[in-house]
């Protein structure tokens, strides 16, 4: 989503935690929150929300777009190789099978997907946290 369309206000999370903690005499951050609609939020907002009890953030929209970016970039790069089975800028008799093979362009989608996942792991302070 376009930055600014979804406005994250972490102070609401803090105030909710403080109220519940005060009312029920619990420990710090007694409620686990899920962060819906994180697309377009700044890293500072995400980190602040985590500090106030966010334990899950939905990133599906960002991941879908990241996968599509890889496929799109592949198609743009090899468009002249994807128009016919035989014949490309290298010659009229040159085969194009290795370019339109789905394993090639799907892999480019996977690589941009992985890159976006790694960014999310970093943003969410979740690098190297599994034993």
Write out the residue ranges for each language-model feature.
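Hydrophobic faces of well-ordered beta-strands that scaffold small-molecule active sites
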Residues: 31-37, 55-59
């Amino acid at each position: 989503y376009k930055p600014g369309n979804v406005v994250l206000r972490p102070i609401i999370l803090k105030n909710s935690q403080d109220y519940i903690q005060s009312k029920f005499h619990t420990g710090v951050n007694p409620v686990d929150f899920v962060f819906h609609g994180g697309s377009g939020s700044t890293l500072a907002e995400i980190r602040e929300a985590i500090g106030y009890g966010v334990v899950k953030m939905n990133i599906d929209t960002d991941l879908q777009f990241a996968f599509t970016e890889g496929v799109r970039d592949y198609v743009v790069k090899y468009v002249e190789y994807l128009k016919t089975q035989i014949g490309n800028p290298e010659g009229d008799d040159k085969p194009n099978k290795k370019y339109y093979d789905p394993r090639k362009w799907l892999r480019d989608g996977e690589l941009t997907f992985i890159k976006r996942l790694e960014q999310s792991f970093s943003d969410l302070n979740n690098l190297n946290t599994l034993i």
